[in-house]
Amino acid sequence: MPQLDTSTWLLTITLMILALFCIYQSKMINQTMISIPPQDKKVIKPTTQLPWESKWTKIYLPHSSPLLS
């Protein structure tokens, strides 16, 4: 029965831990970048008043048709 060669296990495990650390760090950097709240920009509304904005208008809905049973 052949003997199991374990000489590369240390290198494999070390590289796996290093890769997982790099992935974890990149995810943490992305999460901190996203959580920064965006700064509000001041929105300037136009001050022109249109003629129909000052008048009150009533909107009439059409009569509903009688229900047939």
From Swiss-Prot:
The keyword Acetylation applies. The keyword Transport applies. It is found in: Mitochondrion membrane. GO terms for biological process: proton motive force-driven ATP synthesis. One of its GO terms (cellular component) is proton-transporting ATP synthase complex. One of its GO terms (molecular function) is proton transmembrane transporter activity. InterPro entries: ATP8_mammal, ATP8_metazoa. The chain crosses the membrane at residues 8-24. It is a single-pass membrane protein. Keywords: Acetylation, ATP synthesis, CF(0), Hydrogen ion transport, Ion transport, Membrane, Mitochondrion, Transmembrane, Transmembrane helix, Transport. The modification N6-acetyllysine is found at residues 55, 58. Signal peptide: none annotated. The modification N6-succinyllysine is found at residue 55. PANTHER family: ATP SYNTHASE PROTEIN 8. Subunit 8, of the mitochondrial membrane ATP synthase complex (F(1)F(0) ATP synthase or Complex V) that produces ATP from ADP in the presence of a proton gradient across the membrane which is generated by electron transport complexes of the respiratory chain. ATP synthase complex consist of a soluble F(1) head domain - the catalytic core - and a membrane F(1) domain - the membrane proton channel. These two domains are linked by a central stalk rotating inside the F(1) region and a stationary peripheral stalk. Component of the ATP synthase complex composed at least of ATP5F1A/subunit alpha, ATP5F1B/subunit beta, ATP5MC1/subunit c (homooctomer), MT-ATP6/subunit a, MT-ATP8/subunit 8, ATP5ME/subunit e, ATP5MF/subunit f, ATP5MG/subunit g, ATP5MK/subunit k, ATP5MJ/subunit j, ATP5F1C/subunit gamma, ATP5F1D/subunit delta, ATP5F1E/subunit epsilon, ATP5PF/subunit F6, ATP5PB/subunit b, ATP5PD/subunit d, ATP5PO/subunit OSCP. Belongs to the ATPase protein 8 family. This is ATP synthase F(0) complex subunit 8.
